[in-house]
Amino acid sequence: MADRVLVIGSGGREHALAWKLAQSPHVKQVFVAPGNAGTANSGKISNSAVSVSNHAALAQFCRDQEIRLVVVGPEVPLAAGIVDDLTAAGVRCFGPTARAAQLESSKSFTKSFLDRHGIPTARWKSFTDPKAACSFINSANFPALVVKASGLAAGKGVIVASNKEEACKAVNDIMQDKTFGTAGETVVVEELLEGEEVSCLCFTDGVTIAPMPPAQDHKRLKDGDEGPNTGGMGAYSPAPQISKDLLLKIRETVLQKTLDGMRKEGIPYLGVLYAGLMLTKDGPKVLEFNCRFGDPECQVILPLLKSDLYEVMQAVINKKLSSSMPIWYEDSAAVTVVMASEGYPGTYPKGLEITGLSKAKELGLEVFHAGTALKDGKVVTNGGRVLTVTAIKEDLMTALQEANKGVAAINFKGSIYRKDIGYRAIAFLSQSRGLTYKNSGVDIAAGNILVQKIKPLAAATSRSGCNAELGGFAGLFDLKAAGYKDPILVSGTDGVGTKLKIAQVCKKHDTIGQDLVAMCVNDILAQGAEPLFFLDYFACGKLDVEVAQGVIAGIAEACQKAGCALLGGETAEMPGMYPPGEYDLAGFAVGAVERGQMLPQLERIADGDVVIGVASSGVHSNGYSLVRRIVEKSSLDFSSQVGVSGDQTLGDLLLTPTKIYSKTLLPVLRSGHVKAYAHITGGGLLENIPRVLPDSFGVVLDALSWKIPEIFCWLHKEGNLSEEEMARTFNCGIGAVLVVQKELAQQVLKDVQKHEAAWLIGKVVPLQKGSAHVKVHNLLQALQANRSLSVHSHIQGKIQTNKVKVAVLISGTGTNLEALINSTKKPTSFAEIVLVVSNKAGVEGLRKAERAGIPTRVIDHKQYGSRTEFDSAVDRVLEEFSVELICLAGFMRILSGPFVKKWEGKILNIHPSLLPSFKGANAHKLVLEAGVRVTGCTVHFVAEEVDAGAIIFQEAVPVKIGDTVETLSERVKEAEHRAFPAALQLVASGAVQVGEAGKICWK
């Protein structure tokens, strides 16, 4: 049976949505509210006069009309919670919740979110004070010329200034002259990026994303991108500037990362996500997010959709998008041209007759109405952007020509439109018709850019014997200049292994270079050699300059730590050899040792010699195939928070770089006191120590003599590994061992301990026939002992308990709110503020929350007939945000009995006296009248009787001679700012609960 659908909105986007939905065999009728002339009585499509701002009335309309799907076009209803309210009323609605829609409705929230999740964007800062904003513009070390109203401003709240004076004027226009009203109470000032702007949209069910063909909008009013900024004068799709590889990168580094980040923050995002991007020389960077289809992008993207839009949207709502991925027409291009009223984007006339619409249709074009209306049976203008003419052809040039023919056929007085929509794409295509090396996948220009970026990094590693200058055919090293008399050259080569896989998954490329250098230079130390120079090999399928620069910067920094020069290297771009986003590394180190100082000195090693163990920094660079398998089988992933303060991920911990020992151990090795040095690398303790021993000797080690890092304890437990497997695969906390004479052991140990953690861990013993070269005693006990060293184990069990989600209810300035925000931002906090609710609009507390990137909702108590109705509205929002605790911070409403009962033991309030004394609203006045010498504040659970709940925390404040209500109030407020966060921490941690009979229960 076919369904009815309701589309919310009145523009060209909504006409296009209705047009596409009406093509579905599952749909029998499409209502558009309020709609326009194009959606009035057009086949399956008709307009509705239902109020879209009254969500209760809208929900009733949907029930009465048996609406099976509501599709929200514009951003304002999304920010107002239309999806939340309709969904709560049992109406299926396509689009994000109000909380998720903050990605568009609060630019301050969005920029903070992007920074939190490492998604590339312009440098920025938000302000509520215009003077501070202008000071930032004038002092920033980058062009801070983009000024944005943080809130919704109908797509016009962004000013791109040409100089600092213009930027400051924009700030004052927005904040003082209220150009965009309340949307400009907070402004974001950000870096002016250079590049080409594109739009990348996707469908998403919160987990899976389905990218749409990339598009490009044209914001300026006139040809050649001249004139004022508008809501958009035309668009085209697909944008050929975005290659398949680049689109894949955008999908992974922007779209998927955004959805994953929202989900991790407890804000699942469903609907359409629109990323406005700048294609900079450093890669794509996010300019903005929209939480719906763009207008006019929608009018060029939907005509390219081969699939049933109704089915796709239902799959999104059902969270089954992966089983209903949309299919797009491959060999087609779409161009849409906007026709606007004379005077737009300023004031413009209305009611002008539009003719020629049927001629455009006869040309095979789609005309999507926007600012149109019906008057006396005629179509007339009723807005700034009046309509869009869309052509779908086999290529962009033809589509633009056809769209312009349609525009020429349509007429209304004073119409304005652009004739150059898609000019950037046409220029791009005309430059890239011939087959090139770059077309084949090798970008020589990108390689040259990389060389220029890394030249100064290599130059910084210069040392005696060579100047590290890249770009030649080979590098030179002068041993005599380095101070050598009779040297032996020593070389070593190595890679990083599958630790690279973790770096690539975590997109952390800045430390893997140290692993590469360490693996090579630590090896040649086994011959007693000083590392002189290093060469690297970086191989990939597609060169990402930013990634490669990060890796090589890490290599250069590591060379400085090792004391060797980065003399050269090879960057190999080989299309088809590696999957997108993957690369491989290899390194080659050359060192030297004077002929008489070479190691190991096998003939000197004797029974009773002592083994000194030098601490590793962690797993180093071996055993990662096993590590990855253990993580896959565990309950954790690489993004799981670990550490005492939860400020590190498991991926970060596993990517701790390998220690470089050359500078710290070389003086000891040259002292003549060390008989052998072994680098504990692949093969662990069992395989590496025998490499520097005579065949007739082995070693016995005591694992209880050194500290084993807890990462090994976790791997042992989680992987159910045997002692032998641990010792044969991992370094178990020992990165290198030295063999020294027993009588010199303490002296050598002290010398090593000046720079590294080290222990006496064993001794050399004669090897019995058939015996193992290395025996490690007490390894199991050491692993178990170290695993229980601390309650706050780095890796044990559930590494960091999930923070309790808190809502703060306010009515005013939010001074206590600010204290709560500051305390919950600390890594040690057990609480996280996920929502601030005010019963009054425009109060300072809301602005404080927005600056902190915390979602806000205004629920005006005056709009409800009773306390119970108001509390029910609050309760629905709390459930939407999965709130677990409530803090009342200057909330000037008495909560109803049913609400208090539902949230019993979950609501905290603060009172400005030491309860049970001086209850009520005038506590300070009562204190002064009573003549008491001590007052204070009390944090308590809320009960039905005012100020009568169980007391959690109190702080005393002296009453001074001459105190007034004002002076006493200020002193008590300071105590409140300490007491409220302390009480919240007690409750959120579970240390304090409400027990039987409403009494406090301490755990």
Swiss-Prot record:
Segments of this protein annotated with the region Disordered: 214-235
Cofactor(s) needed: Mg(2+); Mn(2+)
Binding site for N(1)-(5-phospho-beta-D-ribosyl)glycinamide: G814, T815, N816, K973, E974, A975, E976
Matching PROSITE patterns: ATP_GRASP, GARS, GART
Marked site (Raises pKa of active site His) residue numbers: D947
SUPFAM superfamilies assigned: Formyltransferase, Glutathione synthetase ATP-binding domain-like, PreATP-grasp domain, PurM C-terminal domain-like, PurM N-terminal domain-like, Rudiment single hybrid motif
Biological process terms in GO annotation: 'de novo' IMP biosynthetic process; adenine biosynthetic process; purine nucleotide biosynthetic process
Cofactor note: Binds 1 magnesium or manganese ion per subunit.
Family (UniProt): In the N-terminal section; belongs to the GARS family. In the central section; belongs to the AIR synthase family.
Subunit structure: Homodimer.
Official protein name in the record: Trifunctional purine biosynthetic protein adenosine-3
